[in-house]
Amino acid sequence: MHDAQVRVAIAGAGGRMGRQLIQAALQMEGVVLGAALEREGSTLLGTDAGELAGAGHSGVTVQSSLDAVKADFDVFIDFTRPEGTLEHLAFCRQHGKGMIIGTTGFDDAGKQAIKDAAQDIAIVFAANFSVGVNVMLKLLEKAAKVMGDYTDIEIIEAHHRHKVDAPSGTALAMGEAIAYALDKDLKDCAVYTREGHTGERVPGTIGFATVRAGDIVGEHTAIFADIGERVEITHKASSRMTFANGAVRSALWLKSKGNGLFDMRDVLNLNEL
């Protein structure tokens, strides 16, 4: 399917997701691990990336400077923090590198910076790189078109204790998919907190609830509730390799693109369904 190999660089190589991405890159056919990055001053600098990820010797040492490895990769994969990702984005735009962005928690200015950069480089920007989650998003659009006008819609998400943003990017993507199907703007209909005497539920709103506990990888449920029945659409992840494999698969797909902003629905061709 892919005539040429794609060389990838991994940001945050020492993190939980970074190590999974390194494993996925080393295991996936057609992909070469070209570089692995960590922050300046990290004790992991100079270590072998494959050994760091528990995947054996790779011959790629962890570096702190993108400039030092700019000749070693075609696509940069970033699941770090918004401020770091935006710095990497500027570098990739300047040097014509494709980018896979799985970082969540961007404000409107950050999202606009990604859109602007996509005029010059190819970017896959997704809240979740799991195949199953993206199929779920498509199912939510279909369900919302049929049931969304007369049901109460709630989104519940659960993640591990270390996750720093809430609601999760995936939960927000679920809300956006539902709102899009109903010709609404999520900003106008989302309810993120309920406390005290809230009064009755406002019709047409989309509620969000967040759980942070233990080592939960990721669980998301959308509820369409009517009187007498409800439909629940749920996705549960048991391993971060699901996300890592999707991200690396996206890098393969992105290799042939010159510029533009894409998401996993483009990669999986779900927009044709």
Swiss-Prot record:
Enzyme class: oxidoreductase
Sequence intervals crossing the membrane: none
GO CC annotation, single: cytosol
Quaternary structure note: Homotetramer.
EC number: 1.17.1.8
Biochemical pathway: Amino-acid biosynthesis; L-lysine biosynthesis via DAP pathway; (S)-tetrahydrodipicolinate from L-aspartate: step 4/4
Keyword flag NADP: yes
Protein name per its UniProtKB record: 4-hydroxy-tetrahydrodipicolinate reductase
Organism in which the protein naturally occurs: Enterobacter sp. (strain 638)
